[in-house]
């Protein structure tokens, strides 16, 4: 269907392999480049299994760090590959859902001990199109989660359990099954309410079914819903984008994710662009759309809590906040990435390998990084700076000094530079981006991260 940081078709910023955030990781062409046109920075992996996840997990207890209280599950099946999507997904013509679920349940059992110190507080099921999984298989998956994990926080309503949904695959029966299994939040991929723009994106759903999907979720007792939109679609006007926002608001969801269209490598959308089939939206139009988003949603009571995410008070995506605040999470399914005890890993993104090459219930892994203080600090700056709450200056400077005493001095100097340029707020106890800074978030983060490099 569609962590951290990207143009997805969902509100979940799914972490990628090791340390690389999805958007804004590459060096921009100027000191404060707009995040609207940042290339994706992903390590060049051959995508073949290189490690046994069991060995990685067995090493984790040797390092300090909180146990994971969050879980990401990736379900790769789609009925059609959207042209802008670079997430691992397959159009399954061989009906591999059942063997996949058998394998997934085994993996969930294998990794459970690393989250067993307490209840799970958040679960996010992404894809792919999770709502395409057959209802009887959803029942099995939800039962397996309840058997292997403590879901008391989620059952009480204090925790969060999100499932991504395509509007065309939402049914009353499926929503009832999800709610009975503890799901209390759905993320509906609308992308646009204009049929011609959906056609450009190769999204196969009727725009009117977005409101229907949200209504069915509510009727089943799933109290929280999020709607995802994309702007900067070729041919899209500022007026059309504002109309999309107002239609989404009329549906009454408490959370919206609004992403600019990014031309990711190895996608059909990028291939079409290179063939000259369309012209990308001008950056000044994208900036106008970005400003319209903030203004329109703020007036409706949805505040920006992250560069591309807006919510009414208390409706923020708690699972996303785990990523952005540098927390720990378990991960299961092909291409899923996890972070526990300073270790980061990415499961194989090939379903055939996922089904056939795991050992002891664990998935084969294509990338792994062990604990690294400097890398962790860089990631915290990149992700936390995108939050409206910003960074605790004293904490980040203390940790920078542990990496290298002079690094803290350089980092503070870089932050003061951002303050002087009006990109970071004047409150020096927390480094928060201003409205102008949010437009240039990746560039500001790069300035701070570069300050950590040895001179």
Where do the language-model regions lie?
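C-terminal scaffold of the Radical SAM
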Residues: 4, 59-70, 89-114, 118-405, ...
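Local cysteine-cluster metal-coordination motifs and their immediate loop/turn environment
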Residues: 74-89
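Structured DNA-binding interfaces in DNA transaction proteins
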Residues: 390, 412-413, 425-426
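Short amphipathic alpha-helical interaction segments
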Residues: 403-419
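A short, conserved structural fragment
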Residues: 419-429
């Amino acid at each position: 269907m569609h962590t951290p940081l990207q143009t997805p078709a969902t509100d979940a910023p799914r972490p990628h392999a090791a340390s690389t955030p999805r958007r804004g990781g590459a060096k921009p062409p100027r000191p404060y480049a707009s995040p609207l046109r940042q290339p994706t920075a992903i390590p060049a992996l051959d995508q073949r299994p290189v490690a046994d996840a069991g060995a990685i997990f067995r090493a984790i207890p040797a390092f300090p760090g909180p146990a994971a209280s969050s879980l990401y599950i990736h379900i790769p099946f789609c009925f059609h590959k959207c042209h802008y999507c670079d997430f691992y997904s397959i159009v399954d013509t061989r009906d591999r859902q059942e063997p996949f679920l058998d394998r997934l349940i085994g993996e969930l059992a294998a990794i459970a001990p690393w989250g067993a110190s307490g209840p799970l507080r958040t679960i996010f099921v992404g894809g792919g199109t999770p709502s395409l999984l057959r209802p009887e298989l959803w029942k099995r998956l939800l039962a397996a989660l309840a058997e292997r994990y403590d879901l008391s926080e989620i059952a009480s309503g204090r925790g969060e359990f999100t499932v991504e949904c395509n509007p065309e695959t939402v049914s009353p029966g499926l929503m009832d099954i999800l709610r009975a299994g503890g799901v209390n939040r759905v993320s509906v991929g609308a992308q646009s309410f204009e049929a011609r723009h959906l056609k450009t994106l190769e999204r196969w759903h009727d725009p009117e079914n977005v409101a229907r999907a949200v209504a069915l979720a509510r009727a089943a007792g799933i109290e929280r819903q999020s709607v995802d939109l994309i702007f900067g679609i070729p041919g899209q006007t500022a007026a059309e984008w504002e109309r999309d926002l107002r239609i989404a608001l009329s549906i009454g969801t408490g959370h919206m994710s609004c992403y600019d269209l990014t031309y990711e490598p190895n996608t059909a959308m990028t291939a079409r662009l290179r063939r000259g089939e369309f012209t990308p939206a001008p950056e000044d139009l994208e900036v106008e759309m970005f400003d319209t988003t903030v203004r329109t949603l703020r007036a409706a009571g949805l505040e920006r809590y992250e560069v591309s995410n807006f919510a009414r008070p208390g409706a923020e995506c708690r699972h996303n906040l785990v990523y952005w605040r540098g927390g720990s999470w378990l991960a299961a399914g092909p291409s899923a990435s996890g972070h526990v005890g300073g270790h980061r890993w990415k499961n194989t993104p090939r379903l055939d390998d996922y089904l056939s090459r795991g050992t002891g219930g664990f998935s084969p892994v294509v990338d792994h990084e062990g604990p690294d203080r400097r890398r962790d600090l860089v990631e915290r700056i990149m992700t936390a700076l995108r939050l409206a709450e910003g960074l605790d200056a004293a904490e980040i400077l203390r940790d920078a000094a542990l990496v290298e005493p002079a690094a803290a001095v350089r980092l503070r100097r870089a932050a003061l530079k951002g303050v002087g340029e009006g990109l970071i707020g004047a409150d020096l106890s927390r480094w928060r981006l201003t409205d102008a800074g949010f437009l240039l978030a990746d560039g500001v983060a790069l300035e701070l991260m570069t300050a950590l490099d040895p001179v």
